[in-house]
Design a protein with these regions (language model features):
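ABC ATPase nucleotide-binding domains
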Residues: 30, 71-77, 81, 85-231
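The feature captures the beta-strand-to-loop junction immediately N-terminal to the Walker
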Residues: 34-36
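Helix-to-loop junction immediately C-terminal to a conserved catalytic motif
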Residues: 49
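Conserved coupling/switch loops of ABC nucleotide-binding domains, chiefly the family-specific signature
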Residues: 55-58, 108, 208, 240
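Conserved ABC transporter NBD signature motif
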Residues: 57-65
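ATPase nucleotide-binding modules
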Residues: 225-251
Length: 251
């Protein structure tokens, strides 16, 4: 499923959080929205999810216009920053939670939950509660819950930010491997440059509610279009100096 945003603007009272954003996310790619706090990346994700309605512009899923369609009818899977697991429900019930709203027959739940837990390597954890799991395991339960819905689009809002730095790398690799094996269109939000450069097929860098550059990790690092992009992507991109002379082959 490819996603297109055309001229999308979002205001909160007098504040323009997103300004005329044009974006094409290709079918099956992992696209990361990267930028500092307050740049508009989470607002963009929430517009794609249907939590917000744009003041201007269009959002397309394939050939379907969705900006007025509720979240429940967009066939998305969402993993929140805090995982949003029900503490009083077992892993099984958490993963199956969305199936009741999609009116999936209860007889199908065991198979679907088992398939989702198999994908994230948590078969055997069905009867445990979130409080009995590590942070990485909770994150995988949240991912399994999203995948159980068989979504066309997977949305992840800073899913690793609550994890210990020691396990962040391994969970990041698991997410990438799973996304590639499923071939699902994935939109990932982070402020962490290393995460974005490691995970993504392409990255959109945001600043002050605008998309300032889109490209592969290599292109953004090697060919930043602005000083902001160069500075945000990596400290090695900027070299301070004074031009004293210009020759044919050297400066």
């Amino acid at each position: 499923m490819d996603i297109r945003l055309t001229g999308v603007t979002k205001r909160f009272k007098s504040v323009e959080a997103l300004s005329r954003v044009d974006l094409h996310i290709r079918d099956g790619e992992l696209f990361t929205l990267l930028g500092p706090s307050g740049c508009g990346k989470t607002t963009t994700l929430r517009l794609i999810a249907g939590f917000y309605v744009p003041n201007e512009g269009k959002i397309m899923f394939g050939d379907r216009e969705v900006q007025e369609i509720p979240t429940s009818k967009r066939n998305i899977g969402m993993v929140f920053q805090n995982y949003a697991l029900w503490p009083h429900m077992t892993v099984y019930r958490n993963v199956a939670y969305g199936l009741q709203f999609k009116k999936v027959p209860k007889s199908e739940w065991p198979r679907i939950v088992n398939e989702a837990l198999t994908k994230v390597g948590l078969v055997g954890y069905e009867t445990r509660y979130p409080g009995q799991l590590s942070g990485g395991q909770q994150q995988r339960v949240a991912l399994a819950r999203a995948l159980a819905l068989n979504p066309d689009v997977l949305l992840l809002d800073e899913p690793l930010s609550n994890l210990d730095a020691k396990i962040r790398g391994s969970v990041r690799a698991e997410i990438r491997k799973l996304q590639q094996s499923l071939g699902i269109t994935t939109v990932y939000v982070t402020h962490d440059q290393e995460e974005a450069l490691t995970l993504s097929d392409r990255i959109g860098i945001m600043c002050d509610g605008k998309l300032v550059q889109i490209g592969t990790p290599h292109d953004l690092y090697e060919k930043p279009s602005t000083r902001f992009v160069a500075d945000f992507i990596g400290t090695n991109n900027l070299v301070a100096g004074t031009v004293e002379a210009v020759g044919e082959d050297i400066i």
